[in-house]
């Protein structure tokens, strides 16, 4: 018998009534998002011939489309996937920064001298003197074509998107690899859309030194995430989002448990722990558990506590290895005092779980703020109002 069943209904209630996204919000925001993206992509393809040639599709990434979003469905991470012509002879090699690679265009000069490929001439402005694709130059190029393409809908610093008779006002903000389009709707709704230009490669370019995927998804992305050192502007961050999505899909209680862990992170103010770190805990669990689905089909309380304990083990070792390259410790950038405080908090949570096994509400203070507790838990006894099916993850 699962000794954590005493808090099962509480976890189900919180997952269903606090964490899970509202269907009406999801549907409404998806309609608006699709219309805005259609406008942007059409204008980019019309105004820039090289973008039109390289663009393939949008990858809808991030926690929202992984079914892991906590809160409101108003933040979207979108990768605009670009491809390079084979005749440029792209060569990907591992960089000396963990998680990064170099991309060299081995035949770029000969390629650009072919009359049929003159539309790619802007590529020569995106590489450094040694033929490596430059992150900052690519981001500058992308910023330029976005702003110039949207000029005809711009008034001052505001971009006006006309959708189904309504005006949605947008502003563009830069941060890291993303250009964030902040949208304000006529009804007061807000939406943040992160657009990132990424390059997509097939399996034959899989970089050495990174774990080989057994996934059905064989392509991977490189992301223009700049390093602080300006001399390293040809370092590209690897992204295996398609493989990770496949690994965590169809795993029973995995997604509800991960959403609970993210909710706990937010409630405890562990802001230095990125959502991707928590996702990585589950990626390692998926590999360690293997093909047996019985673990993920167990109760939500059991799957959640097992993940919390595994998370604590990583914290205790001061090492959370990047799933695709074990030598890359995701916790290396955290100060020891920060890690010590986080370890202490998680130990206290686990101690309360083990010692208060007759109090199903003992876990609540770690998952809900005082305001959330009043708003949600006063609606009725969670032991009676929730059932096991409320924890089902949302599919997109």
Curated annotation (Swiss-Prot):
Q: Which Pfam families match?
A: Mab-21, Mab-21_C
What catalytic activity is recorded?
GTP + ATP = 2',3'-cGAMP + 2 diphosphate; GTP + ATP = pppGp(2'-5')A + diphosphate; pppGp(2'-5')A = 2',3'-cGAMP + diphosphate
User: Mind telling me what this protein is named?
Assistant: Cyclic GMP-AMP synthase-like receptor
What are the record keywords, sorted? Answer: ATP-binding, GTP-binding, Immunity, Innate immunity, Magnesium, Manganese, Metal-binding, Nucleotide-binding, Nucleotidyltransferase, RNA-binding, Transferase
Give the protein's biological function. Answer: Nucleotidyltransferase that catalyzes the formation of cyclic GMP-AMP (2',3'-cGAMP) from ATP and GTP and plays a key role in innate immunity. Acts as a key sensor of double-stranded RNA (dsRNA), the presence of dsRNA in the cytoplasm being a danger signal that triggers the immune responses. Directly binds dsRNA, activating the nucleotidyltransferase activity, leading to synthesis of 2',3'-cGAMP, a second messenger that binds to and activates Sting, thereby triggering the immune response via activation of the NF-kappa-B transcription factor.
A GO biological-process term:
innate immune response
Biological source species = Aethina tumida
Question: Does the entry feature the keyword Transmembrane, yes or no?
Answer: no
Please list the cofactors this protein needs.
Answer: Mg(2+); Mn(2+)
For this protein's source organism, the top of the classification is: Eukaryota, Metazoa, Ecdysozoa, Arthropoda, Hexapoda
Which GO molecular-function terms appear in the entry?
Answer: 2',3'-cyclic GMP-AMP synthase activity; ATP binding; double-stranded DNA binding; GTP binding; metal ion binding; RNA binding
Q: Which residues bind ATP?
A: 63, 75-77, 241-244, 262, 275-279
Q: Where, by residue number, does Mn(2+) bind?
A: 286-287, 292
């Amino acid at each position: 018998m699962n000794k954590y069943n005493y808090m099962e209904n509480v976890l189900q209630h919180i997952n269903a009534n606090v964490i899970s996204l509202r269907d009406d919000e999801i549907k409404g925001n998806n309609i608006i998002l699709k219309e805005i993206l259609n406008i942007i992509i059409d204008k980019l393809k019309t105004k820039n011939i090289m973008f039109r040639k390289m663009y393939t599709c949008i990858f809808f990434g991030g926690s929202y489309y992984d079914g892991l979003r906590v809160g409101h469905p108003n933040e979207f991470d979108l990768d605009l996937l670009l491809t390079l012509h084979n005749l440029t002879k792209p060569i990907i090699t591992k960089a000396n920064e963990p998680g990064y690679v170099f991309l060299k265009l081995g035949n770029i000069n000969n390629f650009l001298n072919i009359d049929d490929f003159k539309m790619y001439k802007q590529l020569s402005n995106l590489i450094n003197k040694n033929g490596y694709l430059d992150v900052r130059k690519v981001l500058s190029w992308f910023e330029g074509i976005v702003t110039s393409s949207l000029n005809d809908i711009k008034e001052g610093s505001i971009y006006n998107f006309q959708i189904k008779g309504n005006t949605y006002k947008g502003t563009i903000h830069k941060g890291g690899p993303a250009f964030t389009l902040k949208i304000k709707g006529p009804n007061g709704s807000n939406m943040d859309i992160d657009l990132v230009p990424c390059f997509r490669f097939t399996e034959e370019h899989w970089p050495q030194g990174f774990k080989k995927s057994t996934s059905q998804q064989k392509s991977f992305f490189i992301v223009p995430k700049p390093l602080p050192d300006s001399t390293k502007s040809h370092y590209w961050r690897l992204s295996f989002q398609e493989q990770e999505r496949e690994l965590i899909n169809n795993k029973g209680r995995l997604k509800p448990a991960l959403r609970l862990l993210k909710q706990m992170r937010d409630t405890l103010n562990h802001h230095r722990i990125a959502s991707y770190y928590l996702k990585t805990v589950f990626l390692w669990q998926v590999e360690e558990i293997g093909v047996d689905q019985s673990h993920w089909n167990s109760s939500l309380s059991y799957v959640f506590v097992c993940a919390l304990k595994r998370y604590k083990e990583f914290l205790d070792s001061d090492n959370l290895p990047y799933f695709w390259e074990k030598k890359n410790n995701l916790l290396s950038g955290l100060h020891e005092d920060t890690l010590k405080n986080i370890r202490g908090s998680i130990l206290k949570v686990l101690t309360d779980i083990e010692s208060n096994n007759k109090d199903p509400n003992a876990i609540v203070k770690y998952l809900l703020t005082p305001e959330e507790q009043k708003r949600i838990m006063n609606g009725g006894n969670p032991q009676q109002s929730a059932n096991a099916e409320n924890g089902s993850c949302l599919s997109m």
